Regions:
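Short catalytic micro-motifs in class I SAM-dependent methyltransferases
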Residues: 117-121
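Class I (Rossmann-like) S-adenosyl-L-methionine-dependent methyltransferase catalytic domain
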Residues: 1-108, 122-138, 143-204
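A conserved beta-strand element that flanks and buttresses the S-adenosyl-L-methionine
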Residues: 114
Length: 204
């Protein structure tokens, strides 16, 4: 599937399904928040949420007082969903970026790079290498990277697309020696349909 076809797939999905109709929906992004807190950073830290289009993590970060938040997603519709949910006042506090992360050009540095369930859709090694290159360019020494994917015993497909399942060692290998693993967790995510999906989260 080309990048254009992938974008069309996600635009169609967000236009035709409500947030409770997608398997990755979380009312509260508890694990992500715990891992971000574990970095020990203050609320003026810059955070980017990759693939966070319609996620409620941005809501939770604003509630905790974070003031330098960027949300990047391939889908314009997903970003519009979050903007509408937040309301104009809160949405204006966030930088919104509609882009393919593998082709995106970072324009600033981020203290935290967070990704829940975007990276595992990159099935082409070239795309994974491009992703890792963006991480290296966007996260300075001393910065933090948090990546959540389906675990080795997690689903093989999501929303009609194939995924790559990971453990922390595999993600470490892709990111390279610039990032040291600080913490790894497995997590059973219960979908709105009542199905348990095994995730792994790695914090570098």
């Amino acid at each position: 599937m080309s990048n254009i076809e992938t974008q069309a797939h996600w635009e169609n999905l967000y236009q035709t399904k409500g947030e409770h109709e997608v398997s990755w929906f979380q009312e509260s992004p508890t694990i992500s928040l715990e891992l971000i807190r574990a970095t020990g950073l203050n609320t003026d830290a810059s955070i980017i949420d990759i693939g966070g289009g319609a996620s409620r993590l941005v809501d939770a970060l604003l509630d905790e007082g974070f003031s330098a938040i960027t949300v990047l997603d391939l889908s314009e519709k997903a970003l519009e969903t979050s903007k509408a949910r937040l309301g104009a006042l809160n949405a204006a506090k966030v930088k919104w970026v509609a882009a393919d992360v593998t082709a995106w050009e970072p324009r600033q540095l981020y203290d935290v790079w967070h990704d829940r369930a975007a990276f595992h859709f990159l099935t082409d090694p070239k795309d994974r290498a491009a992703y890792a290159e963006r991480v290296l360019r966007a996260v300075p020494p001393g910065g933090h990277v948090i990546i959540g994917t389906f675990a080795l015993d997690g689903p093989e497909r999501c929303s009609g697309l194939p995924v790559v399942r990971y453990d922390s060692a595999a993600i470490s290998k892709i990111l390279g020696p610039s990032f040291d693993l600080s913490e790894s967790r497995t997590h059973a995510h219960k979908t709105p349909m009542g199905i348990n999906q095994r995730f792994q989260f790695s914090r570098f």
